[in-house]
């Protein structure tokens, strides 16, 4: 891991990429396991992980939970046409909604794109009615997800 010109920025080498790929597949992998795959000592792997965390390249470690096991089988994407002045009221509202998985500010005909999970279309409909206080909506219900959310590993830092 070589230092670049920017403070706290490091060039990512092939070993760093390998460590990130291994952690992406199993965030609970032990240092010993990572060391055996990378042919480094556990101490060296730990130091690289710490540097990647400090640089912001590794932002956290997550557990993937199956929402269907908890009765949340209706996944939908909701486009919302929100006026810029409404953002100060909308953002706190949407952050407080536990069924909102993601909320993105986007370009195009709508300004916001929400991903939500609900137990039924009835509950989804109630939520959409609440959202319509902020603006016009357009909803797409997901039938299947051939590619689940995944992190993309970097090729190189520019």
Positions of PLM-derived features:
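A compositional/biophysical signature of low hydrophobicity enriched in polar/charged and small residues
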Residues: 1-158
